[in-house]
Regions:
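Short connector loops/turns at beta-strand edges and beta->alpha or beta->beta junctions
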Residues: 114, 123-126, 258, 297
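Iron-sulfur (Fe-S) cluster-binding segments and ferredoxin-like electron-carrier domains
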Residues: 120-132
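Short glycine-rich or small-residue beta-strand-to-loop segments that form or flank ligand, phosphate
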Residues: 107-108, 162-165
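N-terminal pre-triad scaffold of radical SAM enzymes
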Residues: 45, 90-123
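Conserved aromatic-histidine-acidic binding/catalytic patches
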Residues: 4, 33, 37, 41, ...
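Flexible, acidic/Gly-rich N-terminal and inter-domain linker regions that tether
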Residues: 1-100
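Short cysteine/histidine-rich metal-coordination sites, predominantly Zn2+-binding motifs
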Residues: 133-141
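Conserved AdoMet/S-adenosylmethionine-binding subsite of the radical SAM
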Residues: 142-156, 160, 169-314
Length: 315
């Protein structure tokens, strides 16, 4: 049940250390503590996610690498790094709406996620303040959303809107309906993409939060009735994230006719070999998820140990 996962979420370093104290050696525990003291993202991991980590070798585990920093692995940040490395705020005509490309916009509707990734490019806004970063606020706000709707409607070239954050998984069902319906009714909007890491880290929500999934299905059906595409974009980075629960959750999207595409980030030690990426793509294909993007890791504070070279991506 997703409510149990949410209730038992680990959102403090001391809670995490207590949860893993019998799973890992003392040296690893102290290394984690040092890691979070230097991290721009707060700790937020689910029991389900912790269960997928290989605790016989947590240092090299591809899921541990993504969510739990180790102080011993930190490398100096790139000299050109900025907290908002993609300059999303600079290209935002209204708060939380980035309009960089002529026909596409990124709509950051919320500033929380089911878990927090170490390599998040939005550490300037997502989650709570840390020792390293004081966040700006992009909390769910209907008045802020209305300003975004007005801007999108005023720009006829805008056809493709990505609803992200934060994470669309954390939207209430009525917010999913409101956001989806409002965007679909704007004449120039032809495509909507809900973006979420949730399916990879908490598939229980799709299986047990029926109101939320019904809202997503209703928005998709409304879009189809008006000749507009509503798709769901998820974020699996390693084959170990694809489980039986993932398959069951993705079957709900498949049965509802909702297209699901995957966006991966190329991460050192996680998926930066042809073999690991090929296996990920194959397993996603088995659960009806279309490979879509593979991003090269951006300049992110405290995550230089995960960034590959551009040549690695080319190869």
């Amino acid at each position: 049940d997703y409510r149990w996962q949410s209730k038992k979420i680990i959102n403090r370093v001391d809670k995490l250390l207590d949860a893993i104290k019998d799973l890992a050696p003392d040296g690893f525990i102290s290394d984690v503590e040092r890691g979070f003291s230097r991290a721009p993202m707060a700790v937020r991991v689910s029991p389900y996610l912790l269960s997928l980590i290989d605790w016989t070798n947590p240092v090299d585990d591809p899921l541990r690498i993504q969510f739990i920093p180790l102080g011993s692995k930190f490398l100096p940040d790139h000299p050109k790094l900025g907290l908002d490395s993609l300059h999303e705020q600079a290209d935002a005509p209204v708060p939380g709406l980035t309009h960089r490309y002529p026909d596409k916009a990124l709509f950051l509707v919320i500033d929380t996620c089911p878990v927090y990734c170490r390599f998040c490019t939005r550490s300037y806004a997502v989650g709570v303040d840390t020792d390293q970063v004081e966040k700006i606020s992009l909390k769910a706000s209907k008045s802020r959303w209305e300003r975004a709707f007005e801007y999108i409607a005023s720009r006829p070239e805008l056809e493709d809107i990505v609803i992200s954050g934060g994470d669309a998984y954390n939207l209430r069902a009525d917010w999913v309906r409101e956001l989806g319906t409002s965007l679909i009714k704007i004449p120039n909007v032809q495509r909507i993409r809900f973006a979420s890491k949730g399916l990879a880290v908490m598939p229980q929500k799709v299986l047990t939060d029926h109101d939320w999934f019904d809202a997503m299905a209703e928005v998709h059906a409304l879009g189809r009735s008006m000749g507009k595409e509503v798709a769901f974009h998820t974020h699996f980075n390693h084959a170990n994230e694809v489980t039986e629960l993932s398959r069951q959750a993705l079957n709900r999207f498949f049965d509802a006719g909702i297209i699901v595409r995957n966006q991966s980030v190329l991460l050192r030690g996680v998926n930066d070999t042809p073999e690991s990426m090929s296996l990920l793509v194959k397993r996603l294909g088995h659960i009806n998820v279309h490979p879509y993007y593979v991003y090269v890791h951006d300049l992110v504070q405290g995550a230089e140990d995960m960034r590959t070279t551009v040549q690695t991506a080319v190869d």
